[in-house]
């Protein structure tokens, strides 16, 4: 059995390499937008659905018409076609319709690791030299990198590399297929998690873990006002935009660090984690909490928790979103309809008289419900 693991490094390309990376961003953006427009037009006019393989055939003709497309990595252009195809597949599963890519927004491209041969010598197109701290990438050759993983070796087969640019900094994310044997653990501890806005995580142990990341809204608002006053196309506008991007990158990295720290802490202490399935889309429609949801990375946390649990052989159990975790007394199971009101933070059970903290009570109920589901699955 094998699993995929990503390693991200910051890279330091020279002037020529930066030009090639930016040129590849432009070419992949052109291919993506061109085929997105073609798919949209053909479907609207004659209900014809194009596949990725139809577009790959057209890509060859497109490269003949536009010679500059041949200057960049061909694998990156092909991968871009498959990314568009995946975007349409996700759309038919219920996600949003694919959007046209704009210059300067989430710039990245992906290239595959291929086996090449030169003078009877076989070599891979993507290679990492930890000793000299360089990574070899198609069309870029050797690029310097730096990061906390520079002292480690990557075990497994490199499948692809994604080069990205954020706040004028360049990064590479290397996807590796690693051999994996899932650990078999006899669970001895269980925990329930109630996710929220004021307290990010409330555990069934009574612990409240707050969102440690604070967004400097005053500074962000000031920078955005400054950007609005700048003349379009001016150097000052570019500098102001870069300051905003760097602030967002700082916030993103802080949130990522917090998510991994909390996920590791929870999985270190528990073998079974029960968590409520939240309907985040519906929550965004509630005006009073929509703004606060942007500051709480609930979806990212659940994704990290799930994949880390898989790696450690632990279990994450999702509880039905309609389960009344806040309304039921965890002592006598009495259901109090009045607790539906979110302003009720503490309440006394009319049946047994026990005083409840809304979030702690919810996390305890989630834990018990998760334990029931686990026991049923174990019997089956």
Question: How would you name each of these model-derived features?
Answer:
Residues 1-380:
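Nucleic-acid substrate recognition interfaces
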């Amino acid at each position: 059995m094998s699993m995929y693991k990503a390693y991200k490094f910051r890279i330091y390309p020279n002037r020529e390499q930066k030009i090639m990376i930016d040129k590849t961003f432009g070419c992949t953006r052109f291919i993506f937008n061109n085929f997105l427009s073609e798919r949209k037009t053909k479907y609207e006019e004659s209900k014809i659905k194009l596949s990725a393989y139809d577009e790959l055939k057209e890509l060859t003709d497109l490269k003949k018409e536009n010679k500059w497309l041949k200057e960049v990595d061909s694998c990156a252009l092909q991968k871009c076609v498959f990314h568009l195809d995946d975007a349409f597949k996700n759309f038919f599963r219920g996600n949003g319709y694919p959007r046209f890519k704009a210059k300067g927004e989430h710039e990245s491209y992906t290239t595959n690791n291929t086996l090449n041969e030169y003078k009877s010598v076989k070599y891979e197109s993507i290679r990492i030299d930890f000793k000299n701290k360089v990574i070899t990438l198609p069309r870029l050759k050797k690029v310097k990198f730096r990061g906390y993983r520079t002292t480690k070796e990557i075990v497994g087969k490199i499948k692809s590399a994604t080069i990205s640019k954020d706040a004028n900094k360049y990064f590479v994310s290397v996807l590796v297929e690693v051999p994996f044997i899932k650990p078999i653990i006899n669970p001895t501890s269980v925990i329930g998690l109630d996710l929220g806005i004021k307290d990010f995580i409330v555990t069934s142990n009574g612990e409240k873990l707050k969102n440690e990341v604070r967004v400097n809204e005053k500074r962000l608002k000031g920078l955005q006002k400054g950007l609005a006053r700048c003349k379009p196309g001016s150097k000052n506008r570019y500098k102001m935009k870069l300051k905003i991007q760097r602030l967002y990158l700082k916030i993103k990295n802080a949130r990522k660090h917090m998510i991994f720290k909390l996920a590791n802490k929870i999985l270190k202490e528990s073998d079974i984690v029960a968590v409520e399935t939240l309907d985040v889309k519906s929550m965004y429609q509630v005006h009073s909490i929509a703004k606060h949801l942007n500051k709480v990375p609930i979806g990212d946390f659940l994704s990290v928790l799930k994949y880390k649990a898989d790696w450690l052989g632990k279990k994450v159990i999702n509880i039905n979103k309609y389960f009344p975790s806040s309304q039921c007394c965890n002592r006598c199971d009495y259901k109090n309809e009045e607790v539906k009101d979110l302003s009720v933070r503490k309440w006394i059970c009319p049946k047994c008289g026990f005083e409840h903290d809304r979030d702690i009570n919810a996390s305890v109920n989630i834990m018990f419900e998760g334990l029931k589901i686990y026991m049923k699955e174990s019997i089956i």
